[in-house]
Structures are given as structure tokens and as C-alpha cells.
Amino acid sequence: MTMIALNREVETQSLKKLSLKSVRRAREIFSPVHGQFPQPDPESKRIRLCHKIQVAFGGVEPASKPTRIADHNSEKTAPLKALALPGPKGSKELRKSATEKALVVGPTLPPRDLNNTGNPGKSTAILPAPGSFSERNLSTAALMERMPSRWPRPEWHAPWKNYRVLQGHLGWVRSVAFDPSNEWFCTGSADRTIKIWDVATGVLKLTLTGHIGQVRGLAVSNRHTYMFSAGDDKQVKCWDLEQNKVIRSYHGHLHGVYCLALHPTLDVVLTGGRDSVCRVWDIRTKMQIFVLPHDSDVFSVLARPTDPQVITGSHDSTIKFWDLRYGKSMATITNHKKTVRAMALHPKENDFVSASADNIKKFSLPKGEFCHNMLSLQRDIINAVAVNEDGVMVTGGDKGGLWFWDWKSGHNFQRAETIVQPGSLESEAGIYAACYDQTGSRLVTCEGDKTIKMWKEDEDATPETHPLNFKPPKEIRRF
């Protein structure tokens, strides 16, 4: 057979014949009607229609006997009959299998109206079917565990309103921190000063000078009478609040310092900045303990009493967990695609959120597992995030948008827009820092129009006046 195949002559084709064949093929592919749909196939249409009827009416069977009408005073129920529906041609096998897979429904009551006798040849009762629910070929079985039923419903929160505006700074207000006693709070500004304000009255109590650049980070210790500040002048300072002066300075940053955090249980202060590292300092000795590197600027840092004790967010779009015992990275989160400019820990729960221009994401601790995105997209560069114990999270953007969220579900229940002060530009409506007081009932925002705004919940609001408009998502994103 092989020899015969080899000896068979190959038919030669002329160049003209090959050219005509190529032209014919091109016309078949690129003809003007190539974008039109082909004529429907009757056999395919019939099979598709039979399948749809089986899926929709697979649990119904044509009635064999007419249903008798019961007296309206009788307590007896109507006999169980099947709904009489016409089936497709040649669907005897489908109706036979439908009898075995009928929908389970309890006995139906007869109509109350005696005048409405109906057609005695048809019945609307449904037959019970044997077998478990998983054995039935019903289209609704796949909808039993839908996404909305499993998504947590948000709690109702009263809307927040602005009740006080503080003026005094001569530049953008970039940082804020509350006193542990909740009597005063401090703000740092681009005018290189730190101002201390009374929480109850909003009166300016003190102005501290010492930085030669804008103050980007503030923190007040709950274990000592110290306040820490960091700025664009590459300096980190420790202030004695009893003497109102600088008692220590921490030198080592090569560029401006963007963020600052205090460890809750150790005498350690953490600072991150433009030199792409987070530095760990000993408060008393002023020694640099560790240098925690990133690939770009470090914009946010968090400190926790348990592992991971240090969490940093960077311009390289990553979040890193650090082991403070050895100064080594424990994990790297790469869910974000943009700069991670702000992060916040929940005061009670073991979760934290990170804010970026692409989304606001919630992670669980200690492993950093992704929980979910917030259900709305704030189309701003988010500079500030804060969370209180009641589960109200607030985010502030560079365009003046102040959004309030439910922590549990990620539902955005309020969107507020700040109003710039007279004499300021519209571009100065950005929010650069936000912080709740120790009770979580008051909120302070620092803005680009050189003002500080204080917010509180609307006491007159009720669920009736401000109803909860919540729509659960249709799917969960995995990243």
C-alpha cells in the first residue's frame, strides 16, 4: 500500500488555477454578507425549545381527571392534580420524566368564589414528587444560595454633619492627633507650626514652633507625656508636653517624613518617608533599631501589639507586614494597583483597611487575607481613613469628598462635600487627614483651605427620616 501511494502521481495545478482558487476563497471569507447571521436551523430550534420547556415546566404533569369544586364552607382540601399545560411535539418521554420530578408543594385550597367555577377540564393543583431537592431538575435550585443572601446587611448609622470650623493655620493642614484624655487635639500644617486646640470649645490653646518644613505626621503617647511630630524637613521630634519644648530629635531620614506611628506597648516610634524606608526608633536612646525597606515612598504605617506589629503601605502599591523582633518582612500584599496612601485599624476587630486610588480594601489579621472591597468607588485620591468603635469608617479625598461607610458590609451610607472658605481656591478643597476622638462621637478633618472642620452625628436623624438604601453586590471580587 505504501508503494502504491508513493507511485501515485500528484496532480499539478497551474498558477492561474491557484490564483482563481485564492480569489474565490477570499470572496467567501470577506464577502459583504459575512457579518450576517446564518439562517436558523429548524432542528436546532426545536431541540432548544424542548429543552426550555423541560427546564421551565419539568415539574408539571397534564391533568388526567377534572378537579371537582368543593363547597366554600367545607374544610376539605382539593385533590392534588397537575397543571394542564401543552407540551411540545414528541415530548411523551419528557412528560413521563416530569412526573417523577414534580415540584413539591402542599395541598391547595379551593377557590372561595362560587361563581368562579372555572374550566372543569383543567386544574391548577401541583403534584407532590418523591426524592430529595437535589434530585430534582429545577432551574431555581442554583439560585438557593445567591450572593445577596450571604452578604451582611449594614447597620443603620445616623448621618454626620459639620458643626464647627476652626481657623488659625496659614497653610494646608496635613496631620491631626487626639490626646488620650480627650481634652485636646493637635494639628500640623504646611506653615511649619503645631497648634493645640480644645476639643469642647474649639479654642486655640497653644502654638508650637520647631520644624522648618510642613508637619506631615503627629502622634500623642498614651504611656508618656510625649508628643511626636515628623515633617518634610527630614526631622522627627519628641515634645515634652509638660514643658512644651523639644527634648529629643531623631536623625536618619534622607528625605521628607510622610507618616508616623507609636507602638501601643513598646517604647518605639515608627516613621516612613520619601527615602522608601520605614525606620524604627528607640524613644529614649534615639537609636535607630531597624530599617524596613520598600521599593518607593512609604505613605502610611500602622503599629499593633501583636504580630504583625508593623504594617506599612507604599507608593509601590504594596502593603508589607513586618516582624518587629527580627526586622524582617512576614508577608507582602499586592492587591492594590495604585499607591497605598492611607490605612486604618479597627479599634476592636482584628481587621484593617487600606485606601488607594483604585479602591478601598478590607483585610483580616494576622494573615492579611483579603475580605472585600468597599461597595462604592470614591473617584478621588484618598489621603485619610479613620474608623471608630461603632463601625463607621470615613475617607477623605483630594477633591473634598468625605464619604462615610459601614465597616461590616462596606456600604457607603453618606457622601458629604466640604465647602472651601471664602478667599480660598476651589482646588484647595482637599482633605489630608482625619481622626476620631477617643469616644468616636466627634470627627476632625484637616483640609487644604487652611481650616479644621469638626463633625458629629445628626441627633434628629432616625431610620424613618434617613432610610437605609442598600443593594447587595451580585458577586464578590477575589482581589
Swiss-Prot record:
WD repeats lie at residues 168-198, 210-240, 252-282, 293-323, 335-364, 377-406, 426-456. The DWD box is required for interaction with DDB1A. Belongs to the WD repeat PRL1/PRL2 family. GO terms for cellular component: Cul4-RING E3 ubiquitin ligase complex. The keyword Repeat applies. The lineage of its organism: Eukaryota, Viridiplantae, Streptophyta, Embryophyta, Tracheophyta. Transmembrane segments: none annotated. GO terms for biological process: mRNA splicing, via spliceosome. InterPro entries: G-protein_beta_WD-40_rep, Prp46/PLRG1-like, WD40/YVTN_repeat-like_dom_sf, WD40_repeat_CS, WD40_repeat_dom_sf, WD40_rpt. A motif (DWD box 2) lies at residues 310-325. This is Protein pleiotropic regulator PRL2. The gene is PRL2. Keywords: Repeat, WD repeat. A motif (DWD box 1) lies at residues 269-284. Residues 458-479 are annotated as: Disordered. Pfam families: WD40. Pleiotropic regulator.
